[in-house]
Amino acid sequence: MKYVNPCNTVEFYVGEITGTTPQTVKIYTDLNTSVDIEVREGNKWYSYVLPKDKGLCMIEGDSVKKVLVKANISYEPRYITPFTYGKIIPSSTVEASFKGSNLNITDIKGIFQDCSGLTSLDLSGWDTSNVTDMIYMFEWCTSLTSLDLSKWDTSKVTNMSGMFNGCSGLTSLDVSSFNTSMVTNMCSMFGNCSGLTSLDVSSFNTSMVTHMDYMFGRCISLTSLDVSSFNTSNVTNMGSMFAYCSNLTYLDVSNFDTSNVTDMGYMFKGCSGLTSLDLSGWDTSNVSYISYMFKGCSGLTFLDLSGWNTSNVSYISNMFNDCTSLTSLDLSGWNTSNVTDMYSMFKGCTSLTSIRMVGCEKPTIDKIKAQLTKDNITGVTIVTE
């Protein structure tokens, strides 16, 4: 554990210590000197007051179960800054609370990363108005069941990638008050939040965002998600954005501006609850990778991809693999002249009866027919007019 703080009082608690072997917690008064405290069985409170002329405090110890940082009467901790991606508490910590008034947080990237034992976290005293980077902040905090960030000021934050990735114990998360107007990276922001049943991101300002890859990947418990107001005009990567959101039955992405997107691979892979998708208005002129895009979308019966500009696409392998309920597919206007990989494109599409290919040139039509044969899909009518 590393907790760095120009402070005068630090209180911390060590609990759940068993056995007779003394355990050591070190308190560093500066970078070179330290005080060792031996902790035996039982739950104990400790307080260490730094001299006024000491500007740095670091606590370290693998046995720490609970951390409380608060201000004393005369002095209060004001800045919390971990050493370069260092956590301020170890993975064994169960509870952490930061109650100092007006705690000014400056650098919190990765600050609770991999704290898998953490069940309770009180950040009510944090002033986040100067924070620019929240990357990996709570990543793999798998035991957290609740988190109140409703009063946070995120107006200066530019990076939220991986922020809640792996928080599988959370069933709900209120981020509706987040100001995301400066955020450029939301990659894996809610990835692997497998316990989330609801998530309101409808008020997110995404006008600056360039990366949304795996943003909601493996949010397997989400039954609804409103992203219809997302401004995606600057997004370049949407790979795996909704991958394995298997309980989503409806998703409106028809208004997405995809004019700058190059990667859509795995975007809806495993979204087995979706029954239809209308992506006919998407600008795919810069897209090169769409492999596995709909693989495992076993609930899809209709898919409209007409009008797509696929002239720059190179990889289409497994795109519709295991879309077992798909009966019709509209690929009107497609151009596969630059495609180098179509492996298993239609494998498992056992219900497919027609593909609309109006406006497609003969080489593209021939490629599609050949791939249907390779994937052992028979009885499909190609409609060209």
Language-model regions: role of each:
Residues 2-385:
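Negatively charged
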